[in-house]
């Protein structure tokens, strides 16, 4: 069968390539363009039983379709455009159907060893006002995440099956000394008996024109604290003790440490506690010396630099040391042995958990577990140190941590995907290493897109309890602190053996607004998806249960928050 491409009329006979016939193009057909009207040969198009191109089919009309003339009078260009649009639409829909349902499961490649950590260097905390989350806003992606839950649950179950809270092997004192020869040469074995803080006098060999802070690394790398050190520099010579032509300066370490955790309210605790007249903190809120600066880590993304000597760390307590020195001098003049009640504190929220630098300095001879931890060195010098810990539901802590440190593209969807990726990476490590090895694995911590490991409180606390007694800890919950600030602060005062406050001082401390609240732009993002929350509760559940057992307090299981 043959047809006219111009007017689609049927032509006979079948074997002819050119034929003259009468025009049947209809009233609107252009007879000047039709070969039949002009007596010209008609151009034929063969239609057979073979599969035909889609565009060619639209240019052919078979018998009995004359009623479709109105549709077929579209220009060929418009018809082609319509067909191309339909094809593209079909391809897009087919692509979504084939791959869309699975794309949320596409996570990064398995665990690999990488370079130096790139996690944020600032370890800050969360305030009580951020404990409550915003109302839930549904998302299309949340539906597909729910469908993915069984697969993610398998990962969580795999991790839980390998959780073993084993006892770590403790290093002896000689091993510690070999690692930090200079530190052990600077800090003495005994401290002044008349000071609550661990202090001692050391000889200063410089002149009155000598700048004692000239080479301090905290000054060199941070412009923010130069004014503080300028003040210290001007008053330095007047706070020396002069005996038999020699000059001595008072050196001090903290009496207590706020050791963690980040995004759990440590900043708020710090701000309220420093209002007490008997408490003095370091010149910098979070020196991060024990965990980072003594290894030469200024910012994690910058890699290693020169190590900060212990003298630079001790300089941070000179303001407090000056006040303690004045009190000691006054007591000496009165010939009394009255205890100086000023205590020094330090509030680096990385102290409890961050041991990422160990792989660069210590021999890996313990199956991936660090042979030395931060608490080993603190205990070697200060076996009677007091330790404050503020904790929070680790599920909410992780989301707050994500909102604080993520720089762009923050959303509940992005958080869910990062959590899923981090869980897979953690499982991959657990397939080959112990729980402790994975928790302290620098490469893994660097690879995970969210700091999943920071919420494993039980692992860290159990390791701290290998060197310090439980009585040396005061462990608080942010949820309790948020609901009753006055009560938690009184517990802190009692733990640190601080004197009572006046009514005015107490009102100022308890009624001050919360510190370091969540940024407005982060609040507008709302909470995490319920399915993400469920996944994290499943993951952290066994660790929370163990923590509650250690502390003998079910509140730390966070079963209801």
From Swiss-Prot:
Q: Which GO terms describe its molecular function?
A: 3'-phosphoadenosine 5'-phosphosulfate binding; N-acetylgalactosamine 4-sulfate 6-O-sulfotransferase activity
> Where is it predominantly found?
Golgi
Q: What is the lineage of its organism?
A: Eukaryota, Metazoa, Chordata, Craniata, Vertebrata
Binding positions (3'-phosphoadenylyl sulfate): 263-267, 392, 400
Subunit text: Homodimer; disulfide-linked (Potential). The relevance of homodimerization is however unsure. May interact with phosphorylated proteins in resting B-cells, including HCK.
Any known activators or inhibitors? Inhibited by phenyl beta-GalNAc(4,6-SO(4)).
Q: Which family does it belong to?
A: Belongs to the sulfotransferase 1 family.
Q: Function, please?
A: It also transfers sulfate to a unique non-reducing terminal sequence, GalNAc(4SO4)-GlcA(2SO4)-GalNAc(6SO4), to yield a highly sulfated structure similar to the structure found in thrombomodulin chondroitin sulfate.
Q: Keyword set for this entry?
A: Disulfide bond, Glycoprotein, Golgi apparatus, Membrane, Signal-anchor, Transferase, Transmembrane, Transmembrane helix
Q: Where is the signal peptide?
A: none
Could you tell me which residue ranges are on the Cytoplasmic side of the membrane?
Answer: 1-80
Checking SUPFAM superfamilies in the record gives: P-loop containing nucleoside triphosphate hydrolases
**GO biological process terms held by the UniProt record:** hexose biosynthetic process
- Glycan-linked positions: 364
Q: What is this protein called?
A: Carbohydrate sulfotransferase 15
Native organism: Rattus norvegicus (Rat)
Q: Which residues lie on this side of the membrane: Lumenal?
A: 102-561
May I have one GO cellular component term?
Answer: Golgi membrane
The cellular location(s) given in this protein's UniProt record come to: Golgi apparatus membrane
Q: What membrane topology does the UniProt entry give?
A: Single-pass type II membrane protein
UniProt PTM comment: Glycosylated.
> Which domain of life does the protein's organism represent?
Eukaryota
């Amino acid at each position: 069968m043959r047809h006219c491409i111009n007017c689609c009329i049927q032509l006979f006979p079948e074997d002819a390539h050119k034929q003259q016939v009468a025009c049947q193009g209809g009233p609107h057909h252009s007879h000047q363009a039709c070969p039949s009207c002009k007596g010209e040969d008609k151009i034929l198009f063969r239609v057979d039983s073979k599969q035909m191109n889609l565009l060619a089919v639209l240019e052919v009309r078979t018998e009995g379709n004359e009623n479709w003339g109105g549709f077929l009078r579209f220009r060929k260009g418009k018809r082609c455009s319509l067909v191309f649009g339909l094809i593209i639409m079909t391809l897009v829909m087919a692509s979504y159907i084939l791959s869309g349902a699975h794309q949320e499961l596409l996570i990064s490649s398995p665990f690999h060893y990488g370079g130096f950590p790139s996690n944020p260097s600032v370890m800050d905390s969360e305030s009580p006002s951020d404990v409550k989350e915003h109302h839930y806003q549904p998302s299309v992606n949340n539906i597909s995440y729910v469908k993915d839950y069984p697969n993610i649950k398998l990962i969580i179950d795999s991790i839980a099956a390998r959780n073993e809270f084993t006892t770590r092997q403790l290093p002896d004192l000689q091993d510690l000394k070999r690692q930090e020869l200079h530190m052990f040469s600077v800090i003495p074995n005994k401290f002044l008996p008349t000071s609550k803080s661990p202090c001692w006098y050391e000889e200063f060999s410089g002149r009155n024109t000598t700048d004692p802070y000239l080479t301090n690394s905290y000054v060199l790398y941070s412009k923010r604290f130069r004014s503080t050190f300028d003040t210290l520099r001007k008053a330095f010579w007047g706070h020396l003790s002069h005996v038999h032509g020699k000059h001595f300066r008072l050196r001090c370490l903290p009496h207590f440490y706020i050791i963690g955790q980040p995004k759990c309210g440590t900043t708020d605790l710090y701000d309220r506690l420093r209002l007490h007249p008997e408490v003095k903190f370091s010149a910098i809120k979070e020196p991060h010396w024990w965990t980072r600066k003594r290894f030469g880590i200024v910012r994690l993304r910058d890699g290693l630099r020169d190590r900060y000597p212990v003298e630079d760390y001790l300089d941070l307590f000179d303001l407090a040391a000056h006040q303690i020195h004045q009190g000691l001098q006054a007591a000496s003049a009165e010939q009394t042995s009255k205890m100086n009640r000023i205590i020094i504190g330090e509030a680096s929220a990385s102290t409890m958990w961050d041991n990422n630098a160990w792989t660069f300095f210590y021999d890996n001879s313990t199956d991936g577990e660090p042979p030395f931890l931060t608490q080993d060195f603190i205990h070697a010098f200060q076996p009677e140190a007091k330790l404050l810990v503020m904790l929070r539901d680790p599920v909410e802590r992780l989301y707050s941590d994500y909102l604080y440190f993520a720089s762009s593209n923050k959303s509940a969807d992005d958080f869910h995907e990062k959590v899923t990726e981090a869980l897979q990476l953690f499982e991959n490590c657990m397939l080959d290493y112990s729980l402790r090895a994975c928790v302290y694995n620098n490469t893994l911590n660097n690879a995970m897109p969210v700091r999943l490991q920071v919420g494993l409180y039980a692992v860290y606390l159990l390791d701290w309890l290998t060197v310090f007694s439980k009585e040396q800890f005061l462990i608080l919950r942010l949820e309790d602190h948020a609901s009753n600030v006055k009560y938690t602060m009184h517990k802190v005062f009692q733990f640190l053996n601080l004197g009572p406050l006046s009514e005015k001082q107490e009102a100022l401390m308890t009624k001050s607004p919360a510190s370091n609240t969540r940024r407005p732009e982060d609040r507008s993002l709302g909470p995490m998806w319920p399915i993400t929350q469920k996944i994290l509760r499943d993951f952290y559940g066994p660790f929370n249960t163990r923590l509650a057992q250690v502390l003998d307090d079910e509140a730390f299981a966070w079963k209801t928050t």
